[in-house]
């Protein structure tokens, strides 16, 4: 299994089990799904027998909630952004990525700038459709992960900077 981590914070962002797709050479798009989680303990796991103990009516779980699996599994934290503050963060983050690429693969930098500008123009044109997340330590220098929905309106997908991952 390949684990993709934020290059700055070392936070686990996703694994190859999520089937990442490379988009515009410099991004991964990762589909996710909604799931229901509960904080209740299933009594059957500790040997309880609800039907034998008269508890068959206790199947109602009012502590369950619907979550996006990638957000829940990795402890992503929702981050509020307006367009201006997101652009400011993006510029600082890209500076970090470009500095890293200058050392490892300088020929890639012009293409990165070009592709990121094209992709991010689309993001900024549709800014209100995106949600923003970061890993649990809330490091202000960390990658901000974008989340939107596929055309079906039900499938959440996340956008990661490929060169921001290790």
Swiss-Prot record:
GO terms for cellular component: cytoplasm. Coiled coil: none annotated. Its main location: cytoplasm. GO terms for molecular function: calcium ion binding. Keywords: Calcium, Cytoplasm. Involved in calcium binding and microtubule stabilization. This is Translationally-controlled tumor protein homolog. The lineage of its organism: Eukaryota, Metazoa, Spiralia, Lophotrochozoa, Platyhelminthes. The gene is TCTP.
């Amino acid at each position: 299994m390949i684990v993709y981590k934020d290059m700055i914070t070392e936070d686990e962002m996703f694994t190859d089990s999520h089937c990442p797709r490379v988009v515009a050479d410099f991004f991964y798009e990762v589909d996710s799904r909604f799931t229901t989680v509960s904080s209740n303990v299933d009594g059957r796991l500790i040997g309880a027998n609800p039907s034998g103990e008269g508890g068959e009516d206790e199947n109602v779980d009012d502590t369950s909630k619907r979550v996006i699996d990638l957000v829940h599994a990795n402890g992503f934290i929702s981050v509020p952004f307006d367009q201006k503050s997101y652009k400011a963060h993006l510029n600082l983050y890209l500076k970090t990525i470009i500095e890293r690429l200058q050392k490892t693969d300088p020929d890639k930098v012009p293409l990165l700038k070009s592709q990121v500008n094209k992709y991010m123009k689309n993001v900024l044109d549709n800014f209100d459709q995106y949600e923003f997340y970061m890993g649990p330590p809330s490091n202000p220098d960390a990658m901000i992960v974008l989340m939107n929905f596929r055309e079906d309106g039900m499938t959440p997908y996340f956008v990661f900077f490929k060169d921001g991952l290790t």
